[in-house]
Amino acid sequence: MNKKSFCWLLLGLVILCIAFLVKSQQTTQLDHTNYLQNTRPTLFFHGYGSSANAEKHMTDTAKKAGVTETVITANVANDGQVKLTGTIPKGAVNPIIKVEYQNNRTPDPKVISHYAYQVVKKLQDTYHFKEMNVVAHSMGNMSVLYYLLEHGSDENLPKIVKQVAIANHVAGLEGMNLPQGLALDSQTGKPSSMNEQYQQLLGLREVYPENQIDVLNIYGDIGGETDGSVLNISSKALRYLFLQILMSRKSLMKLMSSQTMFWAIRWTKVKSNKP
């Protein structure tokens, strides 16, 4: 290949690369119409025995939909030391932090609460956030709940504005620590029986931030009021820890007009008509 041909080939490759980059930027362009443009970060907490890879599908979907262009990872070592991989640029819109615990199988309340605190403190010290959202799956919910139990009233930490609980098992897991014959009061949502875990979390009724957090509780139903691993009744028990705190402090009328909202979504398995 002569020098002239090589130059033309190089020029062609450069043009292709530029075209690819432009296309990539177009596909990840922020959607200013359908999504709120905010600099508040959202933290994703994975479940038992899992990792940040489990959060990748959701974060990739968020990027493709134009929700954000910024996703970083917070890796938490066994001793609680946090390493941030990636950078959140100043003014980044809806940045996401995938949280990963190296010790991803411990249910110890003090440990998982400390891990969550260390992540929040690291992000606060690095980026000076004053607010945040949290999304947690399965065991990740326990980490968030115990964090709130210990630090929910700490005004020196970033405030949680929105909390999404996916497949939470706050009342216990069937065959492990879920009370037999568990039922929820139709009016208050109070469980008929409480295991040690739930009794500990009752403290949330005293420290859970008032008029601050919007909660979305998501649980699946493949039939039989279960998602296959967690019974719906265990997930529904979350309501008593959050919503009823307002009833203990205010009248019911004030509760109905409260700024704090609690939504519950049940995903059901749809039977296919295909053979």
Where are these regions (language model features)?
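N-terminal Sec-pathway targeting helices
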Residues: 1-14
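Lipid deacylating catalytic domains
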Residues: 6-9, 19-135, 142-275
